[in-house]
A protein has these predicted regions:
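Glycine-rich adenosine-cofactor-binding loop
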Residues: 3-21
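Short active-site oxyanion
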Residues: 4-6, 33, 65-69
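Short hydrophobic segments within beta-strands
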Residues: 7-8, 37, 71, 169
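Short alpha-helical
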Residues: 12-15, 76-77, 107
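Active-site catalytic pocket residues across diverse enzymes, especially alpha/beta-hydrolases
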Residues: 21-25, 85
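NAD(P)-binding Rossmann-fold cofactor-contacting core
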Residues: 24-45
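Phosphate-bearing ligand-interacting subdomains
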Residues: 41-102
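Structural signal for interior beta-strand "rungs" in well-ordered beta-sheet cores
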Residues: 95-180
Length: 180
C-alpha cells in the first residue's frame, strides 16, 4: 500500500517536528518520504532536505493513504486545517519522539505531536491535535481538551482539566488539582 506523510506548516513549529516525524516512521520501520505542506508556495521547494509543496499539489499526489501532522502552534489554525483534512479524507497523523514516555491508561486522540522528553503519566485523556513541546509533562488523572498547546517545559500536575484551545506558556507550572 502506498502511503504519503506530511507536516502541514513549514515555519518554526513544523520544522521542529520534522525530525520527530522522521524518527517516528523509522521506529515503525516505515520508509516513506515526508513532505512539508506550505500554502504560500506556488512551486515546490526544499526545506531542511524535504520537499515542500502547497496543499493542492499534496492532494494530487498518488497514494492509497495520506497522513498529515499539523505543525502550527495556533490552535485555531490547527482546527481549521484538521477540518479541511478530514473533509478531504486525509488522516490526522500523530507522532512522538523516541524518548517520549507514555504510561498506563492514556487515551490520546489523533493529530498529537509529542516532542522529545515529554512524559504522559497514567489515567489521562487528551483531545485532538494536542501539542506537547520539549520537556513538558502531564501527570495522572488529567483531562485535556482539543487543540491544546503546551509550550516547552510545561508542568501539568495531577487532576487538572484543561479546556479546548488553551495555550500554556513556556515553563508554566499548573498546581495539583483535586479529584472529581
Amino acid at each position: 500500500m502506498t502511503e504519503v506523510y506530511a507536516i502541514y506548516g513549514a515555519s518554526g513549529c513544523g520544522r521542529s517536528l520534522m525530525p520527530v516525524a522522521r524518527e517516528h516512521l523509522a521506529r515503525q520501520n516505515i520508509t516513506a518520504q515526508i513532505y512539508f505542506i506550505d500554502d504560500s508556495l506556488t512551486d515546490s521547494s526544499q526545506i531542511n532536505g524535504h520537499t515542500a509543496l502547497n496543499y493542492q499539489v499534496f492532494k494530487a499526489l498518488s497514494a492509497e493513504k495520506k497522513f498529515v501532522l499539523i505543525g502550527s502552534a495556533n490552535s485555531q489554525v490547527r482546527q481549521k486545517l484538521a477540518n479541511k483534512l478530514e473533509k478531504d479524507q486525509i488522516e490526522l497523523w500523530s507522532v512522538q519522539a523516541n524518548n517520549t514516555i507514555i504510561m498506563d491508561a492514556v487515551d490520546i486522540a489523533e493529530g498529537a505531536a509529542l516532542s522529545p522528553f515529554v512524559s504522559i503519566t497514567s489515567n489521562i485523556k487528551i483531545g485532538k491535535c494536542f501539542h506537547a513541546n520539549l520537556y513538558s509533562y502531564v501527570e495522572h488523572d488529567c483531562v485535556i481538551g482539543d487543540y491544546v498547546t503546551f509550550a516547552p517545559g510545561v508542568k501539568c500536575n495531577g487532576n487538572i482539566h484543561i479546556q479546548d484551545h488553551a495555550y500554556i506558556g513556556s515553563g508554566a507550572v499548573i498546581k495539583q488539582g483535586t479529584p472529581d
